[in-house]
Amino acid sequence: SEMCIRDRYMPSNIYAAKAASYLEQRMKACDSSGGIIECRIDGMPVGIGEPVFHKLDAMLAGAVMSIGAVKGVEIGDGFLAAGSCGSKNNDPFYMKDGKPAKETNHSGGILGGMSDGSTILLRAAIKPTPSIAQEQKTITRDGDETTITIHGRHDPVIVPRAVVVVESMVAITILDLLIHNMSAKLDNIRDFYLSRD
């Protein structure tokens, strides 16, 4: 319902109403819909990730792509960057209270495979639920063409259910990289054990 969509997944009353109406149309048509989940990570320390083999963006994308219904991942401006130019896509740096800061965040908080201290922005494209009540073409085990109709109750969209899955995969990946980063430097290991007293 519209209230469930608004309260749990979509803070905008206007878009929650539009989403509820759209999903009702899909249900009446015995069809389904995909969608996009946006995940933001605030407070990430600078320098998490590696410049080549354990790039933060590659690790996050790999983790999120391993979720069954995910068909695409973008970081920052993602595919919009392909139509941009360097002068517009680069994130200008400046000093704020004695620390580096960025005017924009087209990179989505990751530069050169490592976190840059700004908000990490990730989007996951979720495919439409394949189990729909419309008749669909298929083939048998023997290769004969046929049709199939799936009966039962099916969700018109799984995007809301996948939000917590995306959050969990991102959190596990971030934790793994934080532990890896901590143990990669001898000073960090020494400080960790000395601070336990």
Positions of PLM-derived features:
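Hydrophobic alpha-helical scaffolding
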Residues: 8-13, 46-54, 63, 159, ...
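Phosphate/diphosphate-binding glycine-rich loops and adjacent basic-rich segments that engage nucleotide
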Residues: 16, 21-34
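Internal helix-turn-beta structural module
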Residues: 131-197
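Glycine-rich anion/phosphate-binding loop at the beta-strand->alpha-helix junction
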Residues: 29-145
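Short acidic (Asp/Glu) and glycine-rich catalytic loops that position anionic groups and cofactors
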Residues: 1, 38-44, 148-154
